Amino acid sequence: MTNITKRSLVAAGVLAALMAGNVALAADVPAGVTLAEKQTLVRNNGSEVQSLDPHKIEGVPESNISRDLFEGLLVSDLDGHPAPGVAESWDNKDAKVWTFHLRKDAKWSDGTPVTAQDFVYSWQRSVDPNTASPYASYLQYGHIAGIDEILEGKKPITDLGVKAIDDHTLEVTLSEPVPYFYKLLVHPSTSPVPKAAIEKFGEKWTQPGNIVTNGAYTLKDWVVNERIVLERSPTYWNNAKTVINQVTYLPIASEVTDVNRYRSGEID
């Protein structure tokens, strides 16, 4: 079996997992439905997260929170299908050159616009050996131009086939046609990350007060081994359809404890 065939099979498995793990951040409330006055949610997340950096996470607990804090070009809809995220539309030429058109109202939580250059920086950072991302090889599934040589140390990260045509247009060039490429972009590691915050705070950029997000929520509080609290982001482009105002994640590994706290009303 060739390496390409093996990689295609792995990519198919990755896609299935990604589509199954969708997270709904917004909702259309039916006419006549009155929402509860207090819109909060408390969830058991299974364990303490190792990081909130999209390029450092690899477990389900981390991914659950990352999808609330950061939004990539695409997201998964309620049925697990890829849907527009920061990219409101996209097109391709022979499934090899992909162009993503970003929303002009997409913003970071500090009010600055989310741009195509943010994605260029993020994707280059994800494959940078200095980042040591567990998903550094993820973009190989999409056969992005230059990725193999970059991971082998033969080319610089600036040779990755991703380019900002302008603030709201991102062009991605692949080494071969990949019809399913857009589906890969719901993965947390392809989300944009805030360059200014990372350069200012270094490894502490994900701490409350330092972190800048572009998803439906921002980080309000993080008490290790106790709770992570997220609150609704007023700068999120689809904030008008965000229903839950606050989400609290609890790191409860014991199923017995989880059930008992659910029965007592401590977990939703």
For each of these PLM feature ranges, what is it?
Residues 88-135, 171, 261:
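Aromatic- and charge-enriched surface segment that lines or borders ligand/interaction sites
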Residues 92-94, 164-166, 224:
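Residue-level recognition of beta-strand termini and adjacent short loop/turns
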Residues 26-34:
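Cleaved targeting-peptide boundary
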Residues 44-94, 124, 210-213:
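N-terminal lobe/hinge region of extracytoplasmic solute-binding protein
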Residues 37-50, 88, 97-100, 119-122, ...:
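Short, well-ordered beta-strand elements
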